[in-house]
């Protein structure tokens, strides 16, 4: 009863070897028991790989192994694999030997990433570990009735939100195929609001348990003044929009009416490959 999406069609692949002293980066496993522990782990870690996902299931004993984080909600057993920054004592660049006196990565937070960029032609560590990241097409293999729900929970309300979120999952037992948690920090330059907190993405199958769960979920978001991603939520109506974005709803509705209904989506990838 637990499905999950498949990401990627690899058109080309290239093997890359990346070498850096083992004293700089280590991998550490850490177990957590609930969503609040997940949030605190994300919030307090200097560097976590960007995809932290797990599968929710109530009937199977299978383990879904992701890139970083795997486990089942019903068992309350999850495992993070995180990248840990250590202290640099010695670094070799070609024929030169540069000695550092216990330079702390914690104090110089971007040093490791800059060094990685130097050695890998300005590529991020995610692209080093998974070289096909930028050569993929995302598609889902979920059931026909399926939506993705995204929101941003304000920082001060995260703990209470996650407790209630777990409660309504246990209460309604929806088919959730993926939950994505990500620390959110925006200063307002790219958005018309300023928020710090937790960004959540949920893949939900629309079945007999969906309506009751969705109603409680949207009420929970309104209660905690969460920001909803209406681009992803195809079920949201204008009344819900007005409650979430009271300041911008009139402007949004006005511009929606200007959209040309005859416009059809087109993409060069589909023209070339399908």
Q: Where in this protein do the model-derived segments appear?
A:
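Short glycine/threonine-rich loop-to-helix capping motif typified by GTGT followed
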Residues: 64-74, 121-126, 186-197, 239-249
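A generic structural motif
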Residues: 55-56, 84, 176-183, 228-235
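N-terminal flexible segment immediately upstream of the FAD-binding catalytic core
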Residues: 128-147, 179-198, 264-274
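Activity-critical C-terminal alpha-helical subdomain
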Residues: 209, 226-274
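Short amphipathic alpha-helices in soluble, non-transmembrane regions
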Residues: 163-168, 213-221
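A common structural junction motif
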Residues: 169-177, 219-228
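C-terminal structural cap/anchor segments
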Residues: 151-204
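C-terminal substrate-binding/cap subdomain adjacent to the FAD-binding core in PCMH-type
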Residues: 1-167, 175
């Amino acid at each position: 009863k637990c499905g999950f999406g498949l990401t990627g069609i690899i058109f080309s692949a290239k093997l890359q070897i990346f070498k850096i002293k083992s004293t700089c980066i280590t991998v550490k496993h850490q177990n957590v028991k609930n969503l609040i522990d997940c949030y605190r782990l994300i919030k307090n870690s200097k560097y976590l790989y960007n995809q932290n996902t797990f599968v929710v299931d109530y009937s199977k004993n299978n383990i879904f192994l992701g890139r970083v984080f795997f486990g089942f909600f019903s068992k309350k057993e999850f495992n993070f694999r995180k990248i840990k920054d250590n202290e640099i004592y010695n670094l070799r660049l070609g024929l030169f030997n540069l000695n550092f006196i216990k330079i702390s990565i914690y104090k110089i937070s971007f040093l490791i990433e800059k060094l990685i960029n130097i050695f890998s032609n300005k590529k991020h560590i995610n692209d080093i570990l998974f070289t096909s990241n930028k050569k993929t097409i995302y598609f889902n293999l979920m059931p026909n009735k399926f939506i993705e729900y995204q929101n941003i929970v304000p920082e001060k309300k995260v703990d209470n939100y996650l407790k209630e979120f777990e409660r309504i999952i246990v209460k309604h037992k929806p088919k959730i195929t993926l939950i994505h948690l990500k620390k959110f920090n925006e200063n307002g330059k790219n958005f018309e609001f300023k928020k710090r907190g937790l960004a959540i993405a949920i893949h939900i199958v629309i079945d007999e348990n969906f309506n009751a769960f969705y109603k409680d979920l949207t009420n929970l978001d309104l209660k905690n003044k969460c920001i909803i991603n209406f681009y992803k939520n195809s079920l949201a109506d204008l009344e819900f929009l007005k409650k979430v974005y009271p300041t911008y709803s009139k402007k949004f509705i006005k511009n929606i009416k200007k959209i040309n209904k005859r416009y059809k989506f087109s993409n060069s990838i589909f023209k070339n490959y399908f």
